[in-house]
Amino acid sequence: EFFKTFNALIDQNKQLVISADRSPSDLDGVEERIKSRLGWGLVADINETTFELRLGILQAKVEQMNMYVPKDVLEFLARNIKSNIRELEGALNKVTHTSLIGRSMTVESASETLIDLLRSNHRSVTIEEIQKKVAEFFNIKVADMQSNRRLRSLARPRQIAMYFAKKFTQKSLPDIGRNFGGRDHT
């Protein structure tokens, strides 16, 4: 059904925007013909937003809400909430809500209000960084660790890197497995 809809829209010179956490060729459970069609278009890797963009979004949101939030509080939010825009706006809503219950809006009160969110937003390590460090330590290539080759010399480094990936990232076991030769460790 999606395939037919996709083709019908393309035939009508319509544009589609499809979002995923990986490239079309890496999508599991998607037919090859759909992967192929998705590959026709522009595939863009969207990276973390800049401080200036996050601050601009916050300022626009405050203006839209017709509220006053001190500049240092907005800068604090923009500097510390980097994960995604929904979380950034949610943090702004929490901070502005505290002012509605009579607390002053300061960096300190914002920090107290958002303590759990701020704790979870500290930079986390990526699977790629883990693979690089483990490969460097064992003097092997990252590509070998990512391959499906079952050499004894690769097994231990791969196991260690997968253990670290599970321990230090929020990735699921299937996601981790995909980064290590397509293994399914569910």
Swiss-Prot record:
Localization recorded for this chain is: Cytoplasm
Q: Does the keyword Repeat apply?
A: no
Task: Specify one Pfam family.
Answer: Bac_DnaA_C
What segment(s) does the record annotate as region Domain II?
Answer: 1
GO cellular component terms, semicolon-separated: cytoplasm; plasma membrane
Gene Ontology molecular function terms on file: ATP binding; DNA replication origin binding; lipid binding
Q: Where is this region: Domain I, interacts with DnaA modulators?
A: 1
Set out the biological process GO terms recorded for this chain's protein: DNA replication initiation; regulation of DNA replication
Summarize the protein's role: Plays an essential role in the initiation and regulation of chromosomal replication. ATP-DnaA binds to the origin of replication (oriC) to initiate formation of the DNA replication initiation complex once per cell cycle. Binds the DnaA box (a 9 base pair repeat at the origin) and separates the double-stranded (ds)DNA. Forms a right-handed helical filament on oriC DNA; dsDNA binds to the exterior of the filament while single-stranded (ss)DNA is stabiized in the filament's interior.
Q: What is this protein called?
A: Chromosomal replication initiator protein DnaA
Species of provenance: Wolbachia sp
